[in-house]
Amino acid sequence: MRQAFLADEIFTGNETLKGQVLFIENNIVSGILQPGSLPSDITVEKFPDCFIAPAFIDLQLYGGNGKLFSHSLDTESLDATRAYCMTGGCSRFMITMATNSMENFLKGIETVGEYLSSGKKGLLGLHLEGPWINPVKKGAHIEAFIKKPPRKDVELLLEKGRGIVKMITLAPEQCDDEIIHLIMDHGILVSAGHSNATYQQASHAFQIGVPAATHLFNAMSPLQGREPGMVGAIYDDTNVMSSIICEGVHVDYASVRISKKMMGERLFFITDAVTSISEGYYKHVYKGDRYTLPDGTLSGSCMTMMSTLKNSVEKAGISLEESLKMCSVYPAGLLKDPFLGKIQKGQTVDFNIINKKTLELVYSSFH
């Protein structure tokens, strides 16, 4: 199958090209060409007042469309989450489980493994957020399940989760270096979060190889004059990346903008999205612009990656090109996946076509 798409601009992930056509054969980028260079039998699909950009990547969300994965623990909830992601221009996602019972974690691993083996596209793997976090910074997590990591538990999750668990959020002050190294040696991306670490503790974790932090500012020790905390350590270490939530509730837009100035290419977006549910360990209540637990504790967002992009440009004041990179190029870089987040000749591509004026999704190649 051969297709050609013409918009005002194509953002490849590296550069912005004007007036050129994206030519695709069998879902592989055949080239980015001048309109007159196309084969004569190709009909060009035209999208005026739009631009083409790589599809988005979300490394942290818990469910969608009424299905919370940690409660349902079935492939149907992964399908529902995938559908939710696609409505916001996101073609790749990391399903996330907050602090939970070992039984549920193991069931989640089994289900994600089954889904990955089915050949369905979109799911990158499982992100375990907890249980090895600091109860002082638990946020909406269930304190009864929070613990320091017994080695036998770590080894069990690593054994069962091989090739399935791709990311773990933990509090470095709760974990021995040996445990952190053990997890990283299994090829799992370790992210520091839900942590009350001092600046020294956080900096040490980054120095021994922890490459990232989870939802900057939220559930972490703040930056203060006499104690820079984890936020200060993240700002200070030029090798560390961090996710951030951009909807004005979890983090003020000015803080997003300031952090972008401080961190540049090291900052990327997640949605942290949950869905309404009244059963199970995590009961999320929709409050219009956020989700909370029944007691009012902030528990997640109602964002898509598309609405995140729009907020970044219109409310945080970050340039469109950088906002696009924060939704695609930079998380792909953290994953060290050269095939994600860019439009390149010879590669399979997922892309969005977005209205330049409204920043609304017009077309996605992966629906």
What positions do the PLM features span?
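N-terminal metal-binding scaffold of metallo-dependent hydrolase/deaminase domains
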Residues: 1-38, 358, 364-365
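Active-site mouth loops of central-metabolism enzymes
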Residues: 63-75, 142-146, 189-193
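His/Asp/Glu-enriched, well-ordered alpha-helical/loop segment
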Residues: 229-242, 260-347, 351-354
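Conserved, mostly hydrophobic/aromatic
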Residues: 128, 183, 213, 312, ...
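Divalent metal-dependent hydrolysis catalytic cores, especially in the metallo-beta-lactamase
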Residues: 61-66, 79-108, 121-134, 161-175, ...
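Active-site core of metal-dependent hydrolases
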Residues: 155-276
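Active-site gating loops and adjacent loop-to-helix segments of metal-dependent hydrolytic enzymes
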Residues: 83-94, 134-162, 204-216, 220, ...
